[in-house]
Amino acid sequence: MSHPGWIMVSFLTELLSQSSKGIAQSLDNCANDTEIINALLKDSYNKHYIPSHPTHVRVDMWVQEVTSVSELTQDFEIDLYINEFWEDPALVYEDMNPCKRNISFDDKVLQRLWLPNTCFINSKSAAIHESPFKNVFLMVFSNGTLWTNYRMKLTGPCDMKLKRFPFDKQKCYLTFESFNYNTGEVRMQWNQPYPVILLKRIELPDFKLVNFSVIAVEQMYPAGWWDELTVAFVFERRYGWYVLQGYIPTMVTIVISWISFYLGPRAIPARTMLGVNSLLAMTFQFGNIIRNLPRVSYVKAIDVWMLSGMLFIFLSLLELAVVGFMSRNEGLPPKVKKRKRQEDDDEGFSWKSMQTSPHLELRQFWVDKRVNSLRNDSAVPPVEDYAPMELEQPYQNITKRREKRKWMSGLRKKWRAMRELRPETVDFYSAIFFPTAYMLFNISYWSFYLTSLSEYFDEDVNIDQP
């Protein structure tokens, strides 16, 4: 009598043997790729017939590389893979005993199938890579699902806003839609959960990709409504180059222009040369930066910096002119200085009027009144016959003249005080005022532009994705 364990082992061995024979027989009888595609694409298949109304097309994108972002042409170049998925009931082959559940083909077979005819409608240029053959991939699944993949190089538009240049962020767009079919025939949608995938971290010499956003909208055309899938890439500018090549050199140039405050009022030629050279250096640095930028009509952050620096240098030249004017008599003999000072006093004499008492002015008023009456052959009435307002008029005129003399006297005192101010004093206060004002400007400038770098966009997706 056999042991029950051996009976069980014999049974399992026979079962495995029969299963292996069945699998081998099944593989021998399965339909290969050529048989399946020939059977599917026979005369009954019509590539112009829409699989369903509407056909739902799911789209996702793999970003391979961004090669450039240009301010002059306001566009960017990108290499990407675009994937499309849809179902075609005419291509179901599950009942054909296929050897594989999915079959891969090239673009030659793809041209024999119905396609949603999608494209990037806002691209400036687009091309499918050919290295060494056309980079088009087609996979047909046994349940009738199709997957197409194109490796493309595109040039898309960017919405350049340079008000914060070089501390700016730029947004570039690509819009994908079916060129031939409206929403009644083809519905487009992003493939979830990851409609856009970065194959690597995108970093350029002057930009880095920090965010992207996707959106799906319906756009109205004369022929109906179309689904549009838009992806927006957010690039943040790397401003280190501009700090090293623009901001720091201009700071040094402005500081050099302050050296003239310490050279003294007698070194006018050297101070003039220093100020003019600083202004020319600022102009050259400004032109070297903006020559690679578009000619926009608004003020950029770099413009504020450069123009403010030019203003500081120009004000230092004005201070030099004031010092030169104040020290124009320096080095002259004492007698010549005294004569010059006397001439200045004589020029200022025109500012003051004769000091007369109110009684003398009132007497002069009545004398003039009598003379005019005699010239007109008319009798001069006594004072009692004048109206009160007529008697108050000379006193009002006297008051106005006295106020005018007082104002002119104060102005003359200020002029004398300015004349007594020494050029060394002006240089001393300028050496304090200019660095302090420039430091306050720097605090305001960097606080405003560096704290307002963040621009918020709807549906932003962080690039750190699984």
UniProtKB/Swiss-Prot annotation:
CDD domains: LGIC_ECD_GABAAR, LGIC_TM_anion. GO terms for molecular function: chloride channel activity; extracellular ligand-gated monoatomic ion channel activity; transmembrane signaling receptor activity. InterPro entries: GABAA/Glycine_rcpt, Neur_chan_lig-bd, Neur_chan_lig-bd_sf, Neur_channel, Neuro-gated_channel_TM_sf, Neuro_actylchol_rec, Neurotrans-gated_channel_TM, Neurotransmitter_ion_chnl_CS. Residues 264-272, 326-427 are cytoplasmic. Disruption phenotype: Grossly normal movement. The chain crosses the membrane at residues 243-263, 273-290, 305-325, 428-448. Residues 1-24 form the signal peptide. Residues 333-352 are annotated as: Disordered. Residues 25-242, 291-304, 449-466 are extracellular. The keyword Acetylation does not apply. PROSITE patterns: NEUROTR_ION_CHANNEL (PS00236). Glycans are attached at residues 32, 102, 143, 211. Belongs to the ligand-gated ion channel (TC 1.A.9) family. Acetylcholine-gated chloride channel subunit. Forms functional homopentameric (in vitro) and functional heteropentameric ion channels with acc-3 and acc-4 ion channel subunits. Currents in channels are triggered in response to acetylcholine, but not in response to GABA, glutamate, glycine, histamine or dopamine. This is Acetylcholine-gated chloride channel subunit acc-1.
